[in-house]
Amino acid sequence: MIKHETITKILEHGLSKGADFTEVFVEDSKSSSFNLLDRKIDQIQSSNSFGIGIRLLFGDEAYYGYSSDPNEANLIKLTGNLAESGKSGPSTDPETLEKQSVQDIHHVAVNPATVSDQERVELLRKFDESTRSHGGDIQQVNANMLEKQRSVLIANSEGLLVEDSRDYARMRLSAIAEKGDGPQTAAESPGVLGGYEFFREIDVEKISKDAAQSALRMADAGYIEGGVMPVVLGNGFGGVIFHEACGHPLETEAIRKNASPFCGKLGEKVAQPVLTAIDDGTIAQRWGSLNIDDEGMPSKRTVLIENGVLKSYLSDRIGARQVEMERTGSARRESYKFAPVSRMRNTFIDNGNDTFDDMIASIDFGLYAKKMGGGSVNPATGEFNFAVQEGYAIRNGKIAEPVRGATLIGKGFEVLPRISMIGNDLELAAGMCGASSGWVPTTVGQPTLKIDSILVGGR
């Protein structure tokens, strides 16, 4: 990518200017996407990106810059400019760089470069045809394939030198159905950390059926009457609520700024004993997994909440230093254009022992939120608002009619203790998460669970 001699000179220059830590992040990536809309390939895109990010730490203060120009003189100048912003300390020398091996647990079986564009187009057409076969009220189908190959090199003044390759593959399918009272959209978006084999093994019929039937059911649905009520939250992407409303406030990026309701709560009970939550970056082939984080640390499994007790935060180098905890291998960034901060990887509520039937039977009137859509959250307060993509009324302990227009509104810190029943049907779902270090692949997940009371927005 760039010469090791150049990297060493950058590290030396940063420390000579008084920084106590200098880091170099080099990235070379390429991505492509194929998009089918209304039975036609309407967009094919590809891009390449190369650049270098340089970070200097002066105590707890970080200064970051980047360049797409690998010229040595340019990078030395950039390092010097960054150093001018810091509070200079004594000059030191970096440790000698020693290349470290990376254990790759994410095998790529089919190199995307060996696959023809025609094969990709044919797969998208199969998704379109399969989705439309589930009903004439399907008005529109959008199918998209995303592939990305990312190579990174990370070096720092403590002697670290490590390289890693990351291949991503994701399918996004949306179906729009309409039966009179406005269109309804449903989507499925599986993805992996892996190669083109993901697309050759994908279950076209299942994914198409799930999206089409969800859209068709909601097209027939009436509106729910809002209010505070018990909710059974479906597995898989239902975990987006924990991710957004509780996961972000557990990142040291929020904790160190005293911008989280979980500040100072380690060792305290924050949920009922049935709940254990985990962030695990080591699950093979999972969309949010990593061999190493974007500071070069091996990925880890971190128990966030165990039997209702808050056990850990998610930390990067700066966060771990300020919060006085070990690093959890959670430093992430979208690209070389962003400094790394603590971020989630594969974050999920673990399996419990309750059954779906028992959850439904325990409710006289409530909502079964089978599939969640998008929403928003304030990490400082944990306040969230999420749309329900597919929902059903619960009446007298049974699932009743489909309902549309429902939203779940609350505060993560307050909702956690109201989770009283957790099933044993854990599923994980791929997503993209945006924060101060850009958009990164993350996985959310949970078993089906019951929230005793939450505000449901409706009509």
Language model features with spans:
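N-terminal small-residue-enriched
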Residues: 1-459
